């Protein structure tokens, strides 16, 4: 399991311009991530997803996020997420640890 505090810093630096995590948070360029774990791709209510995201059909969890966050466009070709990814596995683990906590509150 990663370091939640390090993960929060990564989220603020690399994710927060496009995503929120709190319950009831608004969608930005990307969807609000509250309730992410256990949700299928393309299912955040009120967000306009690409067909690629809606049709991927996986459920978000530690393993799927670990792979997705390394290279989003490779994992879901056709996603509108413009983020290049996080190459370092430890940084992805930290971010996932933070997301697991922050999106469940």
UniProtKB/Swiss-Prot annotation:
Post-translational modification: Binds 1 heme c group covalently per subunit.
PROSITE patterns (UniProt xref): CYTC
One Pfam entry name: Cytochrom_C
Modified residues (N-acetylglycine): 2
Predominant location category: mitochondrion
Compartments where located: Mitochondrion intermembrane space
InterPro entries, per the entry: Cyt_c-like_dom (IPR009056), Cyt_c-like_dom_sf (IPR036909), Cyt_c_1A/1B (IPR002327)
Record keywords: Acetylation, Electron transport, Heme, Iron, Metal-binding, Mitochondrion, Respiratory chain, Transport
Record-listed heme c binding positions: 15, 18-19, 81
Cellular component GO terms held in the UniProt record: cytosol; mitochondrial intermembrane space
TM segment ranges: none
GO MF terms, alphabetically ordered: electron transfer activity; heme binding; metal ion binding
Known function: Electron carrier protein. The oxidized form of the cytochrome c heme group can accept an electron from the heme group of the cytochrome c1 subunit of cytochrome reductase. Cytochrome c then transfers this electron to the cytochrome oxidase complex, the final protein carrier in the mitochondrial electron-transport chain.
Protein family (similarity comment): Belongs to the cytochrome c family.
Protein name: Cytochrome c
Organism, as annotated: Columba livia (Rock dove)
